[in-house]
Amino acid sequence: MTTSRCSHLPEVLPDCTSSAPSGKTVEDCSSLVNGQPQYVMQVSAKDGQLLSTVVRTLTTQSSFNDHPMCRICHEGSTQEDLLSPCECTGTLGTIHRSCLEHWLSSSNTSYCELCHFRFSVERKPRPLVEWLRNPGPQHEKRTLFGDMVCFLFITPLATISGWLCLRGAVDHLHFSSRLEAVGLIALTVALFTIYLFWTLVSFRYHCRLYNEWRRTNQRVILVIPKSANLPSAQQSLLGLHSFKRNSKETIV
């Protein structure tokens, strides 16, 4: 995960002269609204996918010390309890479980890219139906849809054509027309050979795309150790105290 520099230390003015990380842009981090400076916080996955963006005035930064928030969605603990699953401290030390699982799934990693703490996770493959609904980029969607339409159209056509050719070959054999019968049989074999070759090539191509999608789009479940399974109220209270204590260490 990559974050803009002005989102790490809310007590420090953002450095607007620094360039944004690759795959992400920071827009107008020195703008003024009602005479108050603003700063932009953005969180991106490793592949450049933007996970969250928030714009706040500088006067609201002091509230971060008293009200911890998720470092990805920048929301508090009203909807979901905040956790501290890694060794990050200060404003980057708390995160929602659902946000962390979504980020680990999007970035296809199992560790924190800030403190390099490796999380204990379970990865489960997503169902085939989900891939059929959204196989990936637009050109892959068009290819999958086109091949499915061709398969549904060519399969009965090839079957009927092969049956008619074989029926004609049998009729020619009854009338001692062996040359025509051999020609129809050869046509039937060529027809089914081309059909099977196209089917196998298309099937292998889409199987490769599905296996790659299944490997990079797994559902991640964060496993919290049993020793860390505290009641939600006690865990939130401990997380709040530790956040207040560690947030002072981030001031430089």
From Swiss-Prot:
Zn(2+) 2 binds at residues 86, 88, 112, 115. One of its GO terms (molecular function) is ubiquitin-protein transferase activity. Zn(2+) 1 binds at residues 70, 73, 96, 99. It is a multi-pass membrane protein. Keywords: Cytoplasmic vesicle, Endocytosis, Endosome, Membrane, Metal-binding, Transferase, Transmembrane, Transmembrane helix, Ubl conjugation pathway, Zinc, Zinc-finger. It comes from the Eukaryota. It is found in: Cytoplasmic vesicle membrane; Early endosome membrane. PROSITE patterns: ZF_RING_CH (PS51292). This is E3 ubiquitin-protein ligase MARCHF3. The gene is marchf3.
